[in-house]
Amino acid sequence: LVERNKKMHIKKYPELKSEIDKAYKMVLDKKVLPSMRSMQFGGKPIEISPNRIYNCAYVPVDHIDSFSETMFLLLGGTGVGYSVQKHHVSKLPVIQKPYPKRKRRFLIGDSIEGWADSVKVLMKSYMNGGGSRIEFDYSDVRPKGARLVTSGGKAPGPQPLKECIVKITGILSEKEDGEQLTTLEVHDIVCHIADAVLAGGIRRAALISLFSADDQEMIGCKSGNWWETNPQRGRSNNSACLMRHKITKDFFLDLWKRVELSGSGEPGIYLNNDKDWGTNPCCEIALRPYQFCNLCEVNVSNIESQEDLNERVKAAAFIGTLQAGYTHFHYLRDIWQETTEKEALIGVSMTGIGSGRVLGYDMEEA
């Protein structure tokens, strides 16, 4: 895995071969770690879809393409933070149902792009107006258990996608022409999308949903017996987005009481300075809309000197810089590449802090 990962970077940055070799000697010595997505999908999968090198991303659901992009990212192994805040969802087109007597067949491609396109086609059929009712053809989707050649593993078969399409259609068909999707409906659609993402028969999608602090439907999203009536909501952590400069003590305590009464420990509380910024599912970092996080890690459990620490951090930052250059996203809107290049994040974390070995060293120097 390490050699495959290294060769991928050398192929992209041949002029940096000696520096890459040096940095990856530290990877082999277990002193630093690249992004786990880059280890998992190093080589052809990332060369085909560079988004797969990134652990997580953030997208506001303010555009019809946000739904298909979420499917695309989740299927590629990237966790997704998304916003259903009122000012984002209000930008979505209103519902304009397809003509029931006019039908159009859509053959779903046997690929990540094909699955994402099925969501895109479905959403457009209910939001672009005057279109045909889509009849999805799953015949090209490989059967359950078939080998996935590029990324490895086994195919889930068409059933998870069928269920996803049926459930999303159920939400859309209940609306009247001219109505807008509610924040909770948008949230549920994204959760149904996540339900379709499986690997080896196990759910493999990470989500966090940020919503407006006064959104009562979203606050109660996981109240009552939601796991029976709306089990898809278990795919996402749900967090109220509170503006630090606006929040009052009384409002916070009222919301905290709702958390206690929910019995689920949710909603979470996400403190923010800008309502348009979001985060990744683990809340490790603030992200602009349409931005990816980029992580490397330093093993500090066996640091031997300040110089050793400095060299490890330097190597991790270098690998992170290499990873940040994978931005030619072929399926996503152009704004993803623009944002990720403009705000090229280089995250370097530490593991092994509990050993205490690193506590005596100068972090600022490192």
Regions found by a protein language model. Give the residues of each.
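Extended catalytic cores of very large enzyme megasubunits
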Residues: 1-366
